[in-house]
Amino acid sequence: MITAIIIAKLPEAYTVFRPLVDILPVIPIFFLLLAFVWQAAIGFR
């Protein structure tokens, strides 16, 4: 019974993290750009 209440409350608890979840898929693109800028800085050795 208590677990059912906790599971029901979970979506409300995760509303705080929705902006973070929206940003997460963009992070690999930033790593790709960082690698490109780093290679450009050292002259594509």
From Swiss-Prot:
InterPro entries: PSII_PsbK (IPR003687), PSII_PsbK_sf (IPR037270). It is a single-pass membrane protein. One of its GO terms (cellular component) is photosystem II reaction center. It is found in: Plastid, Chloroplast thylakoid membrane. PSII is composed of 1 copy each of membrane proteins PsbA, PsbB, PsbC, PsbD, PsbE, PsbF, PsbH, PsbI, PsbJ, PsbK, PsbL, PsbM, PsbT, PsbX, PsbY, PsbZ, Psb30/Ycf12, at least 3 peripheral proteins of the oxygen-evolving complex and a large number of cofactors. It forms dimeric complexes. It comes from Gracilaria tenuistipitata var. liui. Belongs to the PsbK family. One of the components of the core complex of photosystem II (PSII). PSII is a light-driven water:plastoquinone oxidoreductase that uses light energy to abstract electrons from H(2)O, generating O(2) and a proton gradient subsequently used for ATP formation. It consists of a core antenna complex that captures photons, and an electron transfer chain that converts photonic excitation into a charge separation. This is Photosystem II reaction center protein K. HAMAP family: PSII_PsbK. Keywords: Chloroplast, Membrane, Photosynthesis, Photosystem II, Plastid, Reaction center, Thylakoid, Transmembrane, Transmembrane helix. One of its GO terms (biological process) is photosynthesis. The chain crosses the membrane at residues 23-43. Residues 1-8 form a propeptide. NCBIfam families: PRK02553.1. SUPFAM superfamilies: Photosystem II reaction center protein K, PsbK (SSF161037).
